[in-house]
């Protein structure tokens, strides 16, 4: 058996190597203890150094956001299943403020307000982190809004135009088509996306707050069927989610949009709707025992929306010239725009599109009340061609509404008033559009210009929309040069106007109304007078046998 020898030098060397590589460390962790947990709110004792909006970790991987920072306790909004929490549970600080992953791979996906995919299509890779609560761009970082954000809806693009970087409120009662207006705006960006031109492409973010899960699934299907999902991200906080998720969802959409905006890209964010976010924030504030104010909303509910919507901007060229356009939706009750939340958001935004239930029930869709709707950016957000053809449209419609109200009491109207009424009826009909069928700027310009020139005056009201659709198809085939000339909203030339007039006259000759009569009838033949007829006498000679 071999003899075991131990060298003291080897032992000394091994001990020296171990001690040189060892660095004594002491980990320090600040923890707290749950005192109460109910209704999505947890009160935690301890953690005197916790930060506002810091993420806290509960047992089972549940996270929360620190909100109330009292001297001896912290009020935490729990994000996730709070029913598993109980008194005495240990809570750990993370040292991080609430943030979400962002990146190009979020396009075409459905995520929750924490940036986690919920569409069953796997994890999202190659991402960066961005804080949810970010300071809005300063005044010096911005430039005036001067690029149009085409919605594809004539009534909006012509009279209440939206620009890239603008905040335009969509407001109205429930079931008046607010979501449809916003979805059509997303669908209208498809041609820009397919062009491949970064200066035209618009990335869209649809934030669904407090909606039914089936409604969100239906919207996703609509976007997919129309080829719009590839440039759209859906941030979903359905009605089944806790109030904390509904409160944070708009900030998640804004953080994702700002990531692209600071890269010099153009983004459209739709918040559907901020009324439900305000209600969720009210519930959180009351559970945190913050003092209530008007309509039981907390005192900082205005700041909740202002700091969110101020993140929409058109950056200056030094920062890349990117933009973030916001379309917040607010639901009113009985068309009452003087309620607390509607007046708050109206004062924050750069204009509003007001949808009325009365117009909707009359078949005017989109049900936009032109008199109340306004865009504070105005013509700066329009192309030169659209600005030129739509200059008198709002005035014509306003005059028609006044005359319509007057005609209800007046028995006799002069010919000029009757003509104005008839043209107004056709303008209202012309501004109606089918859902999910946005129109190009060239289509809109041609329709509005021809209506202003009186080309629709002899078309029966019930045939106006069919006449317009068939006329546009006819013009695409027989006057395609006009579409090329006004592409992108360039003003009409005199040659284009003459060609439009001629092609429209040709089309009218072959167009038949619903009852089968042509618009342009051939003049009836006039009976000839007796002295205008010359007859030769015919003499028949009959031989007798």
UniProtKB/Swiss-Prot annotation:
Q: What is its EC number?
A: 7.1.2.2
Is Transmembrane helix tagged as a keyword? no
Q: Which residues bind ATP?
A: 172-179
Q: Which Gene3D superfamilies match?
A: 2.40.30.20, ATP synthase alpha/beta chain, C-terminal domain (1.20.150.20), P-loop containing nucleotide triphosphate hydrolases (3.40.50.300)
Task: Supply the alphabetized keyword list.
Answer: ATP synthesis, ATP-binding, Cell membrane, CF(1), Hydrogen ion transport, Ion transport, Membrane, Nucleotide-binding, Translocase, Transport
Q: Does the keyword Transit peptide apply?
A: no
The protein's annotated catalytic reaction(s) are: ATP + H2O + 4 H(+)(in) = ADP + phosphate + 5 H(+)(out)
Report how it sits in the membrane: Peripheral membrane protein
Subcellular location(s) per record = Cell membrane
GO terms under cellular component: plasma membrane; proton-transporting ATP synthase complex
Q: Which residues form a coiled coil?
A: none
In alphabetical order, the GO MF annotations are: ADP binding; ATP binding; proton-transporting ATP synthase activity, rotational mechanism
| Positions bearing the site annotation: Required for activity | 373
- What function is annotated for this protein? Produces ATP from ADP in the presence of a proton gradient across the membrane. The alpha chain is a regulatory subunit.
What is said about its interaction partners and assembly?
F-type ATPases have 2 components, CF(1) - the catalytic core - and CF(0) - the membrane proton channel. CF(1) has five subunits: alpha(3), beta(3), gamma(1), delta(1), epsilon(1). CF(0) has three main subunits: a(1), b(2) and c(9-12). The alpha and beta chains form an alternating ring which encloses part of the gamma chain. CF(1) is attached to CF(0) by a central stalk formed by the gamma and epsilon chains, while a peripheral stalk is formed by the delta and b chains.
Q: Which family does it belong to?
A: Belongs to the ATPase alpha/beta chains family.
Protein name as catalogued: ATP synthase subunit alpha
Q: Which organism is it from?
A: Corynebacterium urealyticum (strain ATCC 43042 / DSM 7109)
The beginning of the lineage is:
Bacteria, Bacillati, Actinomycetota, Actinomycetes, Mycobacteriales
């Amino acid at each position: 058996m071999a003899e075991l020898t131990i060298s003291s030098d080897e032992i000394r060397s091994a001990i020296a190597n171990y001690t040189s590589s060892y660095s004594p460390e002491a980990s320090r962790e600040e923890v707290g203890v749950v005192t109460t947990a109910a209704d999505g709110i947890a009160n935690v004792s301890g953690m005197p150094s916790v930060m506002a909006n810091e993420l806290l970790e509960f047992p089972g991987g549940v996270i929360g956001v620190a909100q109330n920072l009292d001297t001896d306790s912290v009020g935490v909004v729990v994000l996730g299943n709070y029913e598993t929490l109980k008194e005495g549970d240990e809570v750990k600080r993370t040292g991080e403020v609430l943030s979400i992953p962002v990146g190009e791979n979020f396009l075409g996906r459905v995520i929750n307000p924490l940036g986690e995919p919920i569409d069953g299509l796997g994890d999202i890779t190659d991402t960066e982190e961005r804080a949810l609560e970010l300071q809005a761009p300063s005044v010096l970082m911005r430039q005036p809004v001067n690029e149009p954000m085409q919605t594809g809806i004539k009534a909006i693009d012509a009279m209440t135009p939206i620009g890239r970087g603008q905040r335009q409120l969509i407001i109205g009662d429930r079931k008046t088509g607010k979501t449809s207006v916003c979805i059509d705006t997303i669908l209208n960006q498809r041609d820009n996306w397919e062009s491949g031109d970064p200066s035209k492409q618009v990335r869209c973010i649809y934030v669904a707050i407090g909606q039914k899960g089936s409604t969100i699934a239906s919207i996703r299907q609509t976007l997919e069927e129309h080829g719009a999902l590839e440039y759209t991200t859906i941030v979903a906080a359905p009605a089944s989610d806790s109030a904390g998720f509904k409160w944070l969802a708009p900030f998640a959409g804004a953080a994702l949009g700002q990531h692209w905006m600071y890269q010099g890209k153009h983004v459209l964010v739709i918040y559907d709707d901020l009324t439900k976010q305000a209600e969720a924030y009210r519930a959180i504030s009351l559970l945190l025992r913050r003092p209530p104010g008007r309509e039981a909303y907390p005192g900082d509910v205005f700041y909740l929306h202002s700091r969110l919507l101020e993140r929409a901007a058109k950056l200056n060229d030094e920062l890349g010239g990117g933009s973030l356009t916001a379309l917040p939706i607010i639901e009113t009750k009985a068309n009452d725009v003087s309620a607390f939340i509607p007046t708050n958001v109206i004062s924050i935004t750069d204009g509003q599109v007001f949808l009325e239930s009365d117009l909707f029930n009359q078949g005017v869709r989109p049900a936009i009340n032109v008199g109340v709707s306004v865009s504070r950016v105005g013509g700066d957000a329009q192309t030169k061609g659209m600005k030129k053809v739509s200059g008198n449209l709002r005035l014509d419609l306003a005059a028609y509404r006044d005359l319509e109200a007057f005609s209800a009491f007046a028995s006799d109207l002069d010919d000029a008033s009757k003509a104005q009424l008839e043209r107004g009826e056709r303008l209202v009909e012309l501004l109606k559009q089918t859902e999910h069928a946005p129109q190009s700027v060239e289509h809109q310009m041609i329709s509005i210009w021809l209506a202003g020139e009186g080309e629709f005056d002899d078309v029966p009201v019930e045939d106006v929309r069919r006449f317009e659709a068939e006329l546009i198809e006819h013009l695409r085939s027989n006057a395609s040069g006009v579409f090329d000339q006004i592409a992108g909203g360039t003003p009409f030339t005199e040659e284009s106007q003459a060609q439009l007039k001629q092609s429209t006259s040709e089309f009218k000759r072959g167009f038949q109304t619903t009852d089968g009569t042509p618009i342009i009838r051939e003049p009836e033949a006039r009976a000839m007078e007796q002295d205008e007829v010359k007859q030769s006498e015919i003499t028949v000679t009959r031989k007798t046998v």
